[in-house]
Amino acid sequence: MSAVDKTNNLPTLDTLQMVISDVDGTLLDKHHRFHFRTYRAMKYIREKYPNFPIVLATGKQRSAVDLIRIPLDLDAFPAAHVNGCVLYNKGKIVYADHLKPEVVMEVVEATKGNPNIANVVYDEHYVYALTPGREDMKNVKRLAEIGEKVDFSMPCEEAIEKVKSGEIKVIKMAVCEDPDKLDVVRDILGKFPREKFATTQALEFCIELIPSNSNKGTALQYITSNILPEVKNENVISFGDGQNDLSMFAIAGWSVAIKNGMPIAIEKAKAVSRVGNEEGAVGEVLERIFNIPEDYTPPPYTF
């Protein structure tokens, strides 16, 4: 926890034009379920202020956040996926950035000496394993368990060939290893020139590689510049728990870190939630800002 109590440092509703939020560790609990308190708060906003944008900014692909997007009808607004490398508006892709195939293969080559490292790549829809890693794809399976759409039907060798040919257009790459061995991955990736990719981390068992020019901050700037130009950055409130949320925190006028988030997120955010994601952190903050009545009962959450 930050040495300074930032739990009450929140904007007033009349100064806000948009909410933008991370997903894992922020909207979802440790079991990767949408917390009811947060669903309730966001549903209230959708009902009372139907034109108030609620934007998802996540490392996940669009298909992996259906449990949030569909019940709240968030296709009405833009969304930033794969750490800002893919932007949607009204459910359609309006921008996508990609890693070069040769860069992906250089990382595969650099990590092949460690058979415990699993390399996976993301396109707009699926995740593909290029190398299996520890204990028969243990960490790849962990991605599937948190909602990532992993294509287990495609052999690693086939996926590699499709990356090389450009048939699989790679938006993000993840280098996976057990959390206590992840420093080995950092050492390997640290030898690459910065212009080849940027690294970030949202999950404890992998380092993510994305195009150097894309992140959640650039996604937010694109949205307010090109899709919702009436929204000013200083009137945006952002929520997040990890390192990959810092670029978004830097652009948004208001930033809220989750109480049990990464120390760097708590340090950099203007505010911190009173409770963690297990207790509906985002919902708790929105209740205060939007003055949500205690007796408000949303429609049943169904997905």
Curated annotation (Swiss-Prot):
Cellular compartment(s): Cytoplasm; Nucleus
Main location as per UniProt: cytoplasm
One GO CC term, this protein: cytosol
E.C. number(s) listed in UniProt: 3.-.-.-
Keyword set includes Transcription: no
Record keywords, A-Z: Cytoplasm, Hydrolase, Nucleus, Phosphoprotein
The keyword Cytoplasm belongs to this UniProt entry's keyword annotation: yes
Annotated NCBIfam families: HAD-SF-IIB
Family annotation (InterPro entries): HAD-like_sf (IPR036412), HAD-SF_hydro_IIB (IPR006379), HAD_sf (IPR023214)
Residue numbers bearing the Phosphoserine modification: 63
Family: Belongs to the HAD-like hydrolase superfamily.
Domain of life, source organism: Eukaryota
Listed GO MF terms: magnesium ion binding; phosphatase activity
Name of the featured protein: Uncharacterized hydrolase C25B8.12c
Disulphide connectivity of cysteines: none
